[in-house]
Design a protein with these regions (language model features):
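An N-terminal-biased, well-structured beta-alpha scaffold segment characteristic
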Residues: 1-100, 104
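Glycine/serine-rich phosphate-binding loop and adjoining beta1-alpha1 elements at the start
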Residues: 2, 73-163
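Glycine-rich phosphate/diphosphate-binding loop of Rossmann-like nucleotide-binding domains
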Residues: 7-43, 150-241
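Short, ordered loop/turn segments at secondary-structure junctions
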Residues: 8-9, 35-38, 70-71, 90-91, ...
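A structured beta-alpha segment of the ubiquitous adenosine-cofactor-binding alpha/beta core
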Residues: 52-61, 71, 218-248, 252-265, ...
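Short hydrophobic/aromatic-enriched beta-strand-loop microsegments
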Residues: 55-56, 84-88, 107-111, 187-189, ...
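Helix-to-beta-strand junctions that scaffold the AdoMet/dcAdoMet cofactor pocket
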Residues: 80, 271-272
């Protein structure tokens, strides 16, 4: 059976690394990697050849296609009827893509629909990406901040530690809390799910309570949209914190919907220069 790994049009990620290809080859699959597919992730074509991958101009016309982003209409047309596509497809946000995939007779596995359960943890690629996003947010913020995160005592005087507010304490938020705390910052965090307070405090951060959210968590463990009353009280908290903290990192997300916009321009203007 053939597996195709296409080059992503606007993403530096690749669906299979040379290590992954080597594992697939041991299982008996023939792996076809599109020219330059791994360059954005620092894997050249030779790295795939060395582990048994075949470099091709088009990897979409295979039995199984592993991709990161959703395919274009032209790429879908390249796929064989009865083939299987494994990718991040966001079916709740783009149901028309799901219909086009079904109309062409393609089997689809959307990696962003893997439930957040211990049994499915090994397949939870979305949480893996969220972990990286939270960590990177702190790294980017530290670079832009311009001074130490941790407090300093020097001959010229004392420098206070940075204060970081993390909104949303899912996988990305907890990763951001851990990274900021390890750099010596004072970390505060808040979430619509008050039950996450214990996780936050165990990581050395302070949990800021807004109030009991009305059904703030779904049955699969993800946050849900909150009511107007909670949103108003949360906005008051964000506005007050914006005047005190040095850095705000927002990781709040609702599956299947655009991420909520929680920080206004006025809040940003009120932050310390």
């Amino acid at each position: 059976m053939d597996i195709g790994v296409p080059r992503e049009a606007s993403d530096t990620r690749v669906a299979a690394t040379p290590t992954t290809v080597a594992q697939l080859r041991k299982l008996g699959y023939h792996v076809f990697v599109e020219t330059g597919a791994g360059l954005g992730a620092s894997f050249d074509d030779d790295a795939y050849r060395e582990v048994g991958g075949v470099i091709v101009d088009n990897a979409w016309n295979r039995d199984i296609v592993l991709a990161v982003g959703a395919p274009s209409d032209a790429q879908l047309l390249d796929m064989r009827p009865g083939a299987t596509l494994i990718s991040f497809l966001a079916p709740r946000q783009d149901p028309s893509l799901t219909r086009r995939i079904a109309a062409q007779g393609i089997n689809a596995l959307s990696m962003d629909m893997v439930p957040r359960t211990s049994r499915a943890q090994a397949l939870d690629a979305l949480s893996s990406l969220a972990n990286i996003s939270g960590y990177r947010a702190v790294v980017e913020a530290a670079h832009a901040f311009g001074r130490f995160f941790t407090g300093q005592v020097t001959a010229a005087g004392k420098v206070p530690p940075a204060t970081v507010l993390v909104i949303g304490t899912g996988v990305a938020g907890l990763a951001a809390i851990g990274a900021a705390n390890s750099l010596g910052a004072i970390v505060r965090a808040t979430d619509v799910r008050p039950e996450t307070a214990e996780q936050v405090t165990s990581m050395g951060a302070t949990f800021l309570h807004v109030g009991q959210a009305d059904q703030g968590v779904s049955s699969d463990g993800y946050a849900k949209e909150v009511g107007a009353d909670y949103a108003a009280r949360a906005a008051e908290l964000y506005a007050a914190q914006a005047r005190e903290v040095d850095i705000i990192i927002t990781t709040a997300a609702i599956p299947g919907k655009p991420s909520p916009r929680l920080i206004t321009a006025e809040m940003v203007k009120s932050m310390k220069a």
